[in-house]
Swiss-Prot record:
Protein name: tRNA modification GTPase MnmE
Record's keyword terms, sorted: Cytoplasm, GTP-binding, Hydrolase, Magnesium, Metal-binding, Nucleotide-binding, Potassium, tRNA processing
Occurrences of domain TrmE-type G (ranges): 219-378
Record: residues binding (6S)-5-formyl-5,6,7,8-tetrahydrofolate: 21, 84, 123, 459
Coiled-coil region list: none
Gene name as annotated: mnmE
Cofactor annotation comment: Binds 1 potassium ion per subunit.
Superkingdom, taxonomy of origin: Bacteria
Organismal lineage: Bacteria, Pseudomonadati, Thermodesulfobacteriota, Desulfovibrionia, Desulfovibrionales
């Protein structure tokens, strides 16, 4: 890491300000060559202060009126000397300035290379580095919260605590191996097993937290299903608050599925409007119905729309029970035209099922439907809204934790069956090494390269 790197750190496009980040031992030296201060009293860059001046090309050509800041190592993001050039945010202007910087024997940074240097220089562990990328990619408040908690180091601290517990168990094993005849070498088997089970429980809770939080990170898919003319497309428009789907009185208007996303209390919901379910001789409509059924089968939640003016039909009852009531919400539409009986959900299925009455035309009940849908998803995933101390590992980390649990279970069975203590010590070292790979202590280089390559350039 002896070379100096640079990249545009702000999103591509046009904006008021664009930032070029430079990191490495030659950062300040190259800044001095390119920057001309507007202040006649300027002599040198004061660290951590913005300096206004002109950026000039090697040909002495004026490029931009900028603010520059020099940040000396080691208390920077990368742990190296860092310079930031705050320029006007024109896309081609930034490219021109970057080309000028790169002419000064500075290399273009690879994707994620600034974060990789921060990790390699000990400014953050691997869980924090991954959190940076997830924070940038977050599309809801709860995703931001989950990523920022890892960026604070909460998961890394939890892993360090688990490793400390494992080291205590390993010390007991080593004493029993090295001093079998002495009092200090008496192996506390039950205490060891209890400690092992406590570690297992801690990791199991982390995995369960990830499973429960899947809806925040991945969102959910909700299919709008029902008979023709039940008002599925009208309901889609009402939920979106805009006219997205074509609505007519003619049956079979929707011949293909439509997809749109909404955010409800930081939960990303992908709504899919499907073709009305019926027997048809139209091959195009039949193809749309088949596609719709596939989307319904794949959906996390089904909003089964009932035409209130038609009421209960045997076909609807059959469809609802085939779809599975555990992922279905019954929606009695057109309540402005006909109010259902108080026990209307029981007319469709003997099982407990959620139901609500709405009018897609007037908007009655739409807000209540969104609340019901939100709570339904949370109940379905056994999820809770994250707080400022919620620790949720990502997919890679969960995979490693799952392997750790398998190793702990094997150790539990083996020590119960009486295997030699020195083999138990080896298994504990293996568990500790797995945990190290999560925070980056023993992570293979190819894994690190793959992780940081997924970052954007400039981060």
């Amino acid at each position: 890491m002896c070379d100096t790197i640079a990249a545009i750190a702000t999103p591509s496009g046009t904006g008021g300000i664009g930032i070029i980040r430079i990191s490495g031992p030659k950062s300040k030296e190259r800044l001095t060559e390119l920057f001309h201060s507007v202040s006649p009293k300027f002599t040198d860059f004061k660290p951590w202060m913005l300096h206004r001046g002109y950026l000039v090309a090697p040909t002495n050509e004026f490029l931009d009126d900028i603010l520059a800041v020099y940040m000396p190592a080691p208390y920077t993001f990368t742990g190296e000397d860092v310079v930031e050039l705050h320029c006007h945010g024109g896309h081609f202007l930034l490219l021109t300035i970057l080309e000028t910087v790169l002419c000064k024997n500075i290399r273009l940074a690879k994707p994620g290379e600034f974060s990789q240097r921060a990790f390699l220089n000990g400014r953050m562990d691997l869980t924090q580095a991954e959190a940076v990328a997830e924070l940038i990619a977050a599309s809801s408040r709860n995703e931001v919260l989950l990523a920022s908690n890892r960026l604070k180091g909460l998961l890394g601290q939890k892993i360090i605590d688990i490793r400390r517990r494992i080291e205590e168990l390993r010390v007991w094993i080593c004493l029993a191996v090295d001093f079998p005849e002495e009092e200090s070498g008496i192996f506390p088997l039950e205490k060891f097993i209890n400690g092992l089970l406590e570690i297992h429980e801690i990791i199991q809770k982390l995995i369960h937290a990830a499973e429960r939080s899947r809806c925040w990170k991945e969102g959910v898919t909700v299919a709008l299903a029902g008979a023709v003319n039940a008002g599925k497309s009208s309901l889609l428009n009402a939920l979106l608050g805009k006219e997205r789907a074509i609505v007519t009185e003619h049956p079979g208007t929707t011949r293909d599925f439509l997809e749109e996303c909404i955010i409800v209390n930081s939960l990303s919901i992908r709504l899919i409007d499907t073709a009305g379910l019926r027997v048809t001789s139209d091959p195009i409509e039949e193809q749309g119905i088949q596609k719709g059924r596939e989307k319904i089968d794949e959906a996390d939640v089904i909003l089964f729309i009932i035409d209130g003016t038609v009421g209960v039909t045997e076909e609807s009852k059959l469809l609802i029970n085939n779809f599975g009531v555990e992922r279905t919400i019954l929606v009695w539409n057109k309540v402005d035209l006909k109010v259902p009986p108080s026990n209307w959900t029981e007319l469709y299925t003997s099982s407990q099922v959620s139901g609500i009455c709405v009018s897609a035309k007037t908007g009655s009940g739409i807000e209540e439907l969104l609340v019901l849908l939100y709570n339904f998803v949370l109940s379905q995933h056994n999820a809770q809204e994250p707080t400022f101390d919620t620790i949720v590992p990502n997919m890679r980390q969960v995979e490693v934790f799952s392997l750790v649990l398998e190793e702990i279970r094997s150790l539990y069975e083996d020590i119960r069956s009486g295997i030699p203590y020195d083999l138990c010590a080896v298994m504990l070292e293996n568990i500790s090494s797995m945990l190290n790979s999560i925070i980056g202590f023993d992570t293979p280089e190819e894994v690190l390269n793959r992780i940081f390559a997924s970052f954007c350039i400039g981060k």
